[in-house]
C-alpha cells in the first residue's frame, strides 16, 4: 500500500520471452516498496508472433505459490496489454478518488533496480493527478527549412530525460515504459480499449507497436500530464551508460521491439503525427 492505495505491478510478454520473464517478475517482487499484487497480463494468442501462449515452469510456480496473478486477457493489445489488461479489470470498480489503486507497468526484459517503485512514488507526484515515469522525452516538430530537419527524422526531434540525471521533476510528452510507469485508473476512459472505433483516422496498426507514443498522446488528449521523477542514482546506475537505469535480461535479445521501431520508423512517426497537438513543442 502507498498512501492507503493498493499498488498493482503489471507486465506482459510474448510467447518467445516466456522462458525468461520470471527474472523480471522476481525483481519486481524484491522491490523495497512491495507491490500488493504482481500481475502478468497475457492474451490467449499473440498477434505479433502468431502463436498461442504456453506458461513456463517458473511462471507456473510463481502463480501456484500465490506470488503473481495470471490475468488472461480477451484481446491482445500488443505491448500496451501490460496496462490495458489490468485497467479493464479495474476501471469500473467503485473506488473513491483518494482510494483508487496505483498501477505500475514494467517491461519484460529488465532486472529492475530494487528502488524502482520508490523512485516513482516517494515524491507523491501520483497524488497530483499526473503519470509518473523514470524516463521520458519531449518531442519537437520542425519545418523543412529548419537546420535540424532531415529526411531521416522527418522533422521530428526528441530530447530524452532520465530521472537519475535530473535535479528536479521534468514535464515530458512521451513516457518510456522501459523505465516503469505509474498510473491511476481514473486517467483513462473506456475508449482506450478500442480507440479506432471512435477515431477512424487513428493509425491502429502502427500504434500497436508504439504503445508509449499512443498512451502518451491519448493521455495528453485527456488532459493528463506526464512527468519524470527525479531520484538519486544507485551505485550500480552510477556505472551505467547515460539514460540506462536497469540491467537487461536475456529477453532483451529475444524479438526486441526496438528493432521493429528502428527498421520501420514510420510506425512511430505516424502515431506522433496523429497526436500532433501533444507532440508539437517549439524550438
Where are these predicted regions, by residue range?
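C-terminal catalytic/acceptor-binding lobe
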Residues: 2-7, 20-24, 190-283
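Short loop->beta transition adjacent to catalytic acidic/histidine clusters or analogous donor-positioning motifs
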Residues: 5-8, 29-40, 67-69, 101
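Active-site beta-to-alpha loop of glycosyltransferases that engages the nucleotide-sugar donor
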Residues: 11-22, 33
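Short beta-strand/turn micro-motifs composed of small residues
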Residues: 11-13, 42-44, 133, 230
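Short, acidic, metal-binding catalytic loop of nucleotide-sugar glycosyltransferases
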Residues: 24-37, 44-47, 60-61
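Active-site-proximal specificity loops/subdomain of glycosyltransferases
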Residues: 43-100
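Conserved catalytic core of nucleotide-sugar-dependent glycosyltransferases
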Residues: 86, 111-199
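Short beta-strand-to-loop acidic/aromatic patch adjacent to the donor-nucleotide binding site
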Residues: 95-111
Amino acid at each position: 500500500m502507498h498512501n492507503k492505495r493498493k499498488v498493482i505491478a503489471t507486465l506482459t510478454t510474448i510467447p518467445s520471452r516466456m522462458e525468461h520473464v520470471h527474472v523480471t517478475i522476481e525483481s519486481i517482487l524484491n522491490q523495497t516498496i512491495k507491490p500488493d499484487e504482481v500481475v502478468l497480463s497475457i492474451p490467449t494468442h499473440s498477434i505479433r508472433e502468431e502463436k498461442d501462449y504456453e506458461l513456463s515452469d517458473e511462471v507456473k510456480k510463481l502463480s501456484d505459490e500465490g506470488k503473481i496473478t495470471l490475468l488472461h486477457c480477451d484481446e491482445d493489445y500488443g505491448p500496451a496489454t501490460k496496462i490495458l489488461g489490468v485497467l479493464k479489470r479495474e476501471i469500473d470498480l467503485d473506488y473513491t478518488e483518494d482510494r483508487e489503486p496505483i498501477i505500475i507497468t514494467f517491461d519484460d526484459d529488465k532486472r529492475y533496480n530494487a528502488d524502482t517503485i520508490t523512485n516513482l512514488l516517494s515524491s507523491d507526484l501520483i497524488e497530483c493527478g499526473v503519470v509518473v515515469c523514470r524516463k521520458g522525452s519531449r518531442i519537437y516538430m520542425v519545418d523543412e527549412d529548419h537546420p535540424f530537419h532531415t529526411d531521416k527524422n522527418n522533422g521530428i526531434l526528441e530530447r530524452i530525460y532520465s530521472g537519475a540525471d535530473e535535479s528536479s521533476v521534468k514535464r515530458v510528452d512521451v513516457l518510456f515504459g522501459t523505465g516503469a510507469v505509474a498510473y491511476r485508473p481514473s486517467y483513462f476512459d473506456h475508449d482506450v480499449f478500442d480507440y479506432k472505433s471512435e477515431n477512424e483516422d487513428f493509425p491502429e496498426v502502427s500504434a500497436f507497436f508504439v504503445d508509449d507514443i499512443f498512451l502518451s498522446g491519448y493521455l495528453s488528449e485527456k488532459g493528463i500530464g506526464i512527468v519524470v521523477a527525479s531520484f538519486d542514482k544507485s551505485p550500480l546506475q552510477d556505472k551505467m551508460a547515460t539514460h540506462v537505469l536497469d540491467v537487461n535480461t536475456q529477453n532483451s535479445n529475444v524479438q526486441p521491439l526496438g528493432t521493429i521501431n528502428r527498421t520501420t520508423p514510420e510506425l512511430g512517426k505516424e502515431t506522433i503525427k496523429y497526436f500532433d497537438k501533444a507532440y508539437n513543442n517549439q524550438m
